[in-house]
UniProtKB/Swiss-Prot annotation:
Belongs to the GreA/GreB family. Pfam families: GreA_GreB, GreA_GreB_N. Keywords: Coiled coil, DNA-binding, Transcription, Transcription regulation. The gene is greA. Residues 41-62 form a coiled coil. GO terms for biological process: DNA-templated transcription elongation; regulation of DNA-templated transcription elongation. Necessary for efficient RNA polymerase transcription elongation past template-encoded arresting sites. The arresting sites in DNA have the property of trapping a certain fraction of elongating RNA polymerases that pass through, resulting in locked ternary complexes. Cleavage of the nascent transcript by cleavage factors such as GreA or GreB allows the resumption of elongation from the new 3'terminus. GreA releases sequences of 2 to 3 nucleotides. This is Transcription elongation factor GreA.
Amino acid sequence: MTRAGFTALDDELKTLKTVERPAVIRSIAEAREHGDLSENAEYHAAREKQSFIEGRIKELEAILSLAEVIDPAKLSGSIKFGATVTILDEETEEERTYQIVGEAEADIEAGLLNIKSPLARALIGKDEGDSIEVKTPGGERGYEVVSVRFV
């Protein structure tokens, strides 16, 4: 996991524990004051939200406890985890830049490519100038590696 990914997940965990959890506990207490819990929609909604928050806290704690933080700036060579890669779509001539990251921090819209994705798996081990073929739901796509950076 990159340092930025670790920090983002750690920040989310802190927010859940210090802001979200206390807020939902207050919501449950307020809903209880309204009387009969069997037909109290506010109470049931707050309990459901509490369950989600507690589940996410456990999930984040597990991810962070097992995370190995890697500094991409200390890496070099061919494409590997942490690399920032610019590729050229050979069909559309469109360039895209992605950083190859772990599952927990992946966000394709932000240019953070899951290392387990077909595109990332095809890129691993390649160098600038190499071409790759990736099977997509729309058929095979060809890409050329334009640049590889470790930042």
